[in-house]
């Protein structure tokens, strides 16, 4: 039997997602970790590490794919850097309103550099997007409601932490129903800052401005922290001319662990298509799975 050539992956960013991505890569037999890319200030303070820790992708050799674990607002810049080096990328960019435009911009860069970018490949957007598409296959006419939580939103929490005056933060997503959500934000305030001013800045951030948002000052965010999250997705629609077709999908998960697992599967899948930028619904689901295609078909079909 020929020796399988492993996919050489670089991890860009080493927060919660980056750490869980390393775990998922170590659990995947078809991957090897080339190294971790961090900010220069973090590299100096990294200490001993199982893998090389560098400040730029150029310092790593033979990278097949870069898994971008940066905050969403830094994803496009990180993707451009990697793609211009001819390195394919996968990310979990989660600002829904910006996905289509970012895909169009990265598509041009990816094609120019003979690489591929898989964007918004977390669980939502990402795997939930695939489920929503499949539900529309089953019932083309109808309504799908996606209800998140209750649970910790990684993207919203990171967005709050970036606001001036916030020392620590937790953003909880509470489902109201029919796709409507309430944001419960808990913050530790930096000394010298006015709570009302900081709370107003949070409520007017793009992550929160369209939802009912409550901001509460707390002594310790760590005392509240739970990385659990979940989703309930329902569709009621029509198959052919038959009414009242009902579908439901539920999951309760550790947020960064699932996001990271899907990112690693995406790192496998993004090496299959021709150059360009893609979302998860554009790539065959079989490409996300490890193993021989014929074996997968026999097992799942």
Model-assigned labels for residue ranges:
Residues 247-301:
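NAD(P)-dependent Rossmann-like dehydrogenase/reductase catalytic/cofactor-binding core
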Residues 56-57, 62-65, 72-94:
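Rossmann-fold NAD(P) dinucleotide-binding segment
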Residues 93-117:
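Rossmann-fold NAD(P)-binding glycine/threonine-rich loop
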């Amino acid at each position: 039997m020929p020796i399988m050539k492993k996919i050489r992956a670089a991890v860009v960013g080493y927060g919660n997602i980056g750490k869980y991505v390393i775990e998922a890569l170590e659990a995947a037999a078809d991957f090897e970790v080339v190294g971790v890319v961090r900010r220069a200030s973090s590299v100096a303070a990294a200490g001993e590490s199982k893998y090389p820790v560098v400040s730029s992708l150029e310092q790593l050799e033979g990278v097949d794919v870069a898994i971008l674990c940066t905050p969403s607002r830094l994803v496009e810049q990180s993707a451009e850097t990697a793609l211009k080096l001819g390195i394919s990328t996968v990310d979990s960019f989660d600002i829904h309103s910006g996905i289509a435009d970012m895909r169009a911009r990265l598509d041009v860069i990816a094609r120019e550099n003979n690489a591929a970018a898989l964007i918004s490949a977390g669980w939502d957007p990402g795997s939930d997007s695939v489920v929503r598409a499949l539900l529309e296959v089953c019932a083309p006419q109808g309504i799908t409601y996606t209800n998140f939580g209750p649970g910790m939103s990684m993207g919203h929490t990171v967005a709050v932490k970036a606001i001036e005056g916030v020392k620590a933060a937790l953003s909880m997503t509470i489902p109201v129903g029919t796709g409507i959500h309430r944001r419960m934000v808990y913050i530790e305030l930096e000394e010298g800052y006015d709570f009302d001013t900081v709370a107003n800045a949070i409520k007017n951030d793009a992550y929160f401005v369209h939802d009912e948002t409550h901001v509460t000052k707390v002594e310790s965010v760590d005392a509240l922290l739970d990385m659990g999250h979940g989703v309930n997705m329902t569709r009621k629609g029509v198959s052919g001319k038959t009414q009242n077709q009902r579908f439901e999908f539920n999951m309760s998960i550790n947020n960064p662990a699932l996001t990271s697992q899907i990112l690693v599967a995406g790192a496998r899948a993004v090496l299959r298509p021709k150059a360009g930028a893609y979302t998860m619904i554009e790539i065959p689901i079989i490409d996300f799975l490890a193993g021989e295609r014929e074996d997968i078909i026999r097992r799942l079909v």
